[in-house]
């Protein structure tokens, strides 16, 4: 440890400011960890671990609001004296070091107490986690590669949010840090790769992973009907047309199989064959309506529907791999990635409904899943103002989150932002208990629910968040044994 200064006037049990020794202002920087020997080197009241934030440089002769000789001298090109300059940092206490780990500090931090900078050999995390059952991430404290970051294993199923603007490194962080962590904790990982570019290309050749295209997966019949409802503008607003679609969807897998066989035998497009089967079925149902007025209305609605609805709209829901078979593949693989690239939004959301309903039913049966569900582009599933099928997906995420805490289901939601149009629905976000904040979008810099509201109580400003380098994240919440957010980073493996 290195002595760097003493506690200044105005300290409390939760705040202190250290005045740096002369010459250390260029060496000591924000986010470093320090140890306060509260009360002095000899017989201190306690020893407090803290993190440096909020640096401040003071020179009373260089105030921009008053005219002094030093200011005049500087205006004409001179260099004023630095003899009375004072440099300081605020200290956010992490906790008191005890034989059982860390405890909250309840004693006033005494002015004049010496402050020591922790160096590479003074790894503090062994002190933090003495009581907790922890795993160690491959991430480390910024500036100290040997200080691996501990994670409280118990809180993994309490759900995770990863936030960062484009280019902040959130996908890399998830691939290289979170997914290996979940596997180390005994979880199987299912990744929903919304664009098909952030995860699927990196796991295609991995022996412990499998990539499957969304178009190969079938949906449950309720989700197929929700998808068709969205694509047909609520079946043209006609109950008879809706009933016709509903009856066709019954036994969907068999109908898809029949269309595939016929297409192969006759050299046709499978989706065109299935489309014709569906259209003929709907027209037949309408033809059998006995009430003349109802029949006329259904015919008009049917024409509207099939002007809007095209054969290619069926392609995303013609898969044959069931959700049960998809989850079954997790028994032999650590990781399965669903490549959703190229599919229509409605098809992606329809698949998620099928998956989430099945997961929920398993948990209702009392089964512990031990699955981590990683959802890229989470606002697509749970936007701030959900409409249509997104209302259903948002509600299902809330249900999964509530029951998942008890049934070992981890939800990891990845988003460009925290609030508003780039963020996750507020009701869903309240279910996430661990957060990784990367470089934020300017829309998140202020206002209710933004990054500033989450982190400013810990001395982290929006200015800092806007300027974070890629791959740097503030780690906060239930999985972090430290009650104060810590700035962490990682080194992606070569190749």
What is the meaning of each model-derived region?
Residues 1-159, 163, 177, 366, ...:
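Basic- and hydrophobic-enriched, low-structure N-terminal and domain-boundary segments
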């Amino acid at each position: 440890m290195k002595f760097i200064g003493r506690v200044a006037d105005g300290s409390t049990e939760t705040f202190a400011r250290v005045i740096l020794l002369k010459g250390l202002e260029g060496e000591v920087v924000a986010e470093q960890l320090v140890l306060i020997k509260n009360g002095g080197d000899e017989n201190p009241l306690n020893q407090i671990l803290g993190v440096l934030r909020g640096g401040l440089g003071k020179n009373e002769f260089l105030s921009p609001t008053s005219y002094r000789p030093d200011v005049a001298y500087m205006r004409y090109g001179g260099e004023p004296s630095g003899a009375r300059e004072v440099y300081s940092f605020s200290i956010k206490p992490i906790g008191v070091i005890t034989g059982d780990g860390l405890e909250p500090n309840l004693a006033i931090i005494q002015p004049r107490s010496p402050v020591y900078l922790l160096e590479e050999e003074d790894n503090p995390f062994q002190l933090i986690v003495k009581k907790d059952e922890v795993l160690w991430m491959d991430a480390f404290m910024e500036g100290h590669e040997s200080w691996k970051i501990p994670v409280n294993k118990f809180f993994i199923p309490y759900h995770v949010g990863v936030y960062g603007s484009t280019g902040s490194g959130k996908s890399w962080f998830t691939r290289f840090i979170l997914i290996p962590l979940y596997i180390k904790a005994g979880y199987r990982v299912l990744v929903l790769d919304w664009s098909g570019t952030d995860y699927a290309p990196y796991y295609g050749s991995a022996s412990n992973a499998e990539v499957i295209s969304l178009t190969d997966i079938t949906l449950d019949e309720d989700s197929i009907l929700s998808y068709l409802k969205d694509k047909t503008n609520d079946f043209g607003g006609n109950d008879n047309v809706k009933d016709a679609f509903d009856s066709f969807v019954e036994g969907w897998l068999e109908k898809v199989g029949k269309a595939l066989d016929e297409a192969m035998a006759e050299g046709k497009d499978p989706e065109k064959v299935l489309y014709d089967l569906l259209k003929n079925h709907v027209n037949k149902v309408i033809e059998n309506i006995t009430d003349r007025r109802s029949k006329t209305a259904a015919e008009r609605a049917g024409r509207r529907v099939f002007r809007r609805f095209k054969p290619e709209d069926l392609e995303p829901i013609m898969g044959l791999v069931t959700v049960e078979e998809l989850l079954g593949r997790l028994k032999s693989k650590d990781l399965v990635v669903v490549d959703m690239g190229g599919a229509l939004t409605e098809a992606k959301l329809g698949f998620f409904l099928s998956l989430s309903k099945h997961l929920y039913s398993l948990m209702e049966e009392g089964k512990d899943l031990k699955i981590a569900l990683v959802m890229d582009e989470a606002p697509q599933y749970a936007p701030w103002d959900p409409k249509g099928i997104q209302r259903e997906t948002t509600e299902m995420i809330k249900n999964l989150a509530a029951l998942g805490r008890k049934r070992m289901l981890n939800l990891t939601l990845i988003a460009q932002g925290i609030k508003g149009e780039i963020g996750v629905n507020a009701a869903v976000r309240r279910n996430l208990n661990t957060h990784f904040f990367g470089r934020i979008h300017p829309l998140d810099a202020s206002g209710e629910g933004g990054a500033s509201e989450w982190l400013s109580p810990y001395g982290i400003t929006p200015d800092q968040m806007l300027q974070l380098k890629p791959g740097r994240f503030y780690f906060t919440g239930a999985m972090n044994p430290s009650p104060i957010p810590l700035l962490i980073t990682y080194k992606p493996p070569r190749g």
